[in-house]
Amino acid sequence: MTTSSNLISSDIEEYLKVHENKDMLRVLTCGSVDDGKSTLIGRLLFDSKMIFEDQMAAIEKDSKRFNTTDDSFDLALLVDGLQSEREQGITIDVAYRYFTTEQRKFIIADTPGHEQYTRNMATGASTCDLAIILIDARHGVQVQTRRHSFICSQLGIKHVIIAINKMDAIDYDQATYQKIKKEYREFAEDLSFSDVRFVPISALKGDNVVNESPNMTWYPGSTLLKLLNTVSVEQDRSESFRFQVQYVNRPNLDFRGFCGTIGSGEIRVGDTVATLPSNKESRVKSIVTFDGELEKAVAGQAVTLTLEDEIDISRGDMLVRPHDKPFSVSHFEADVVWMTEEPLCVDREYAIKVGSKSVYGYADAINHKVDVNTLEKQSAQQLALNEIGNCHFAVTEPVQFDAYDTNRSTGSFIIIDRLTNVTVGAGMIRNPIEVKSTKAHEYSEFEIEMNALVRKHFPHWGAKDISKG
């Protein structure tokens, strides 16, 4: 493998130091079936000189074995790792690939295009900053293009590059490119993207992927890789300090630290913080890491914080700025992606996990589900596998969160089946719900005892605990 940096051959330690300090961009690729997502990632890796010689030899061998292309080798096989993917020529699982340029590091998630793998795509999109949505130049904007764009919008991705692929198949026709560009812009007006860019490419031939295309001199913009290198996503990240405690570290009587990853914002030694839900305040005494103590820590860093005062803090509690607190309520509105065969039912109790805080809760109403192909809102009594819906949730105790649109790290949650411990859904919190206090229904002693027996002997019914109101 060759690299664009000469440091790797002359000074490996300096190369690693420079590499560590590069900005990280998480990228999602999605589009209709056979639009060329895996081939595009393979082309990025190949033209960036990020492929080992033994990998190339293996790909040439597999290309002949699976007959996936008429060329000597199929770049898509760099990404399609599952046996069933290679045999069918499609992507099923979310495949992650890593590469670096002089400007930044990349993690690329190659997600499946088929509707039955919507949950896989949602999983890949949940951590990405930017999406590359591929459109086949021969077919234009398809139903799956709309579905993937909607899911990206729902999951908070603000930056989108529309890569109009297979331009070689239409003789690099500018009019077709402009027509597709206009059609997508009209469709995307209702979505929450803040930055949409277009680039005509041929992943198979390499046009406008890493190198400029001599076949499309009419295109004045940048190549795909240049767009990836220059897009700025810093302004999308919340500046509010959020630190959720994952573990209380007490190795001896003289040390009590609170371990976790900073979700957003930054913290310095001496800063005043408030603990939630107790609302007690203290100051940061030290910021401890494996490599030693720090004066300052920022979003994404895993650290241990110690405080000047002895405050009762447990796993799931949150440290924030006293003047900048999140919502803390037990009822909220959320969009949910359902991920299992057994549907989401109203009033069935689940384990709800917001960050490291675990509570029990249920959907007390499904406001609507969304047809991901037409974006039409439909009434629903339940959510089936791969469906997306808007629900009202009630949990047993207040949880601390920000709206997902403003802070993805604290505005997301997962839904867990209490019996199997399987993650059955993923949610994005949109708004808190203020519940007007009303006189609680008075249950008889017999009803409470019967409810307790049902929950004990028939837990799979998912009955609520009526003794808690």
Swiss-Prot record:
It comes from the Bacteria. One of its GO terms (biological process) is hydrogen sulfide biosynthetic process. The keyword Transferase applies. CDD domains: CysN_ATPS (cd04166), CysN_NodQ_II (cd03695), CysN_NoDQ_III (cd04095). The keyword Cell inner membrane does not apply. With CysD forms the ATP sulfurylase (ATPS) that catalyzes the adenylation of sulfate producing adenosine 5'-phosphosulfate (APS) and diphosphate, the first enzymatic step in sulfur assimilation pathway. APS synthesis involves the formation of a high-energy phosphoric-sulfuric acid anhydride bond driven by GTP hydrolysis by CysN coupled to ATP hydrolysis by CysD. It is an enzyme of class 2 (transferase). Its EC number is 2.7.7.4. Residues 110-113 are annotated as: G3. It catalyses: sulfate + ATP + H(+) = adenosine 5'-phosphosulfate + diphosphate. Residues 202-204 are annotated as: G5. GTP binds at residues 31-38, 110-114, 165-168. This is Sulfate adenylyltransferase subunit 1. Residues 31-38 are annotated as: G1. It comes from Shewanella woodyi (strain ATCC 51908 / MS32).
